[in-house]
Amino acid sequence: MSEYQVAYLPIGVPTFHLESAQAGFEKSVRLLTSLSTHVVCPQKMLLTIEELNTFLDMICPQLLIIQNITFANAAYASQIRHRFSCPTLLWTLREPVIDGGRLRLNSLTGAYSAANAMRALGDDRFAYVFGAPEEEAVIHKIHAFLRAGEVYHKLHSLKMAAVGHTPQGFGFGRALDSELLHTFGVTLESIETRELMEKAVSYTEEECADCRKAAEQAMTGLENTPAKNRDAFVRLYKAYDDYVKANGIGALSSRCWPDFFTAYGTPVCSVLAMLNDNLIASACESDVYGALSMYIGTQLTGLPTFFGDPVSLDEAENTITYWHCGTAACSLARADTGAQVGVHPNRKIGPTMEFGCRPAEQATVFRVGRKPDGTFRLLILPGRALDKPKQFCGTSVVVQPKADALRVVESSVKAGWEPHFTVIYGDVKDELLALADMLRLEAEVYE
C-alpha cells in the first residue's frame, strides 16, 4: 500500500486581494502541518489551472483538502476530481474584512462553485468546514477529518483473523470476507481454534517464558490460578501472539465457549485481554464486526477499547452498564484494584479478568453494525465512563451517555442493533462521523 499522504490544494484566481489570500495561505499551512506530518503543501497558492495541474502531477494523495483561498470557478474542482477520487474536505475561508470596501476573497462563492461541480461528478460525501485557520471549531473539524482519514487509510491495509466460528445464535458477528473487503478495504483470513490449541501444547516451558512474564506483570493474582490452568493460559497466549505476529494480524475475533472449556480446559478470555493491551483489537464470541469496531477505536485513541454486552440500565442515574466475562485489557482496570484475575462466571474455570474499568470524562460507545439487507451502519453514543467498581463477575464499565439512557436503549433495541458494543476511551464522535462519510455509511448518533 502507498504511503499515506494528505494534499492541501489552495485554489483561487489572481484577481482578488492577494495580500489577504497570502495571509490565509500561510496560516493554513502552519495549521495543517501542525496537525499532521502527512500533509503536503504547495510552495505557493494555486491561482491558475496550470499551476494546479503542475502540483497535482507531483502528488499521490489518499486525502484531499480543497480550500478556496479566493473564489475559483468550477474548472478547478472538476480538474481535481477528474484526477483523484479520494475523501475530500472542502474548506471556505471567512472574509477577513467587511468595511464597505473591496471583497477580499469571495471564498464562499468559490465553495458553492466547487461543491456544485463535485456533486455533478458523483461526489456527494465530501466534508465541509467554514472559517479561518485560527478558529477553534475549524481546527477541531479539520483535525477530526485528518484523524478519520488516517484510520480510513489503515483499514485498507488491515488484515483481520476469524479464529473459529460463531456459536449457535451468534451469527450477527459472522462476516463475509468479500463484504469486509468491499466496504472497508479489510482482508479477512480464518483459522480453526484447534490449530492454535495444538500449537499451544507443543511449546516448551522455556519458549513461553516471555509471555509468562508479561502476563504476571500485567495481572494481579495470576499466581492464585491453579498451575495447570495458568500454564495452559500462558501457552495459549503464546500461540495467539505468535500467530498474530507471523501473519500481520491487526485485529481478530475468537470463538471462546464451549471449545476452550471442553477441548482445552482453560478459557481464552485472558489471552484476548493481553492481546488488547498489545493493541491487537480482540473480540470474543467470534464477533468480527465487534473486533473491527474495537480496531477503529484503538486507532483513533492509541488505547485499548472495552468490548461487551449492554446488561443493565439505571434510569435514575442515566447509565448503561456494559459487561463481559473477562476479556478487558488489563490497562483498563481501576487503579485501586488493578487487573484482578478470577474464574469464568459460568464455567468456574480461570484465568479470566475480574475488575471494574477506570473512569473517563469522555467516552464513546460505538458499533459497526450490519443491517439485514447487507449494508452497514455505525452507532455512535457519546458520554463518559463513571468511577464505578465491578458490577458483576467479569469486567464492566458504567457509561453515562449525554442522551437519555432509556431512550437510547429503547431506540437501539427497536433499531435491531447487535448485542455487542465497544466503549472507546475518548470523545471521537466527530472522527467517527467523518469516517462514516468516507466509507459511505449511515451513522446513527445518540446525543
From Swiss-Prot:
It catalyses: 6-sulfo-beta-D-quinovose = 6-deoxy-6-sulfo-D-fructose. Its EC number is 5.3.1.31. It is an enzyme of class 5 (isomerase). It comes from the Bacteria. One of its GO terms (cellular component) is cytoplasm. InterPro entries: Fucose_isomerase_N/cen_sf (IPR009015). One of its GO terms (biological process) is monosaccharide metabolic process. GO terms for molecular function: L-fucose isomerase activity. Keywords: Carbohydrate metabolism, Isomerase. SUPFAM superfamilies: FucI/AraA N-terminal and middle domains. Belongs to the SqvD family. Part of the sulfo-TK pathway, a D-sulfoquinovose degradation pathway that produces 2-hydroxyethane-1-sulfonate (isethionate). Catalyzes the isomerization of sulfoquinovose (SQ) to 6-deoxy-6-sulfo-D-fructose (SF). This is Sulfoquinovose isomerase. It comes from Clostridium sp. (strain MSTE9).
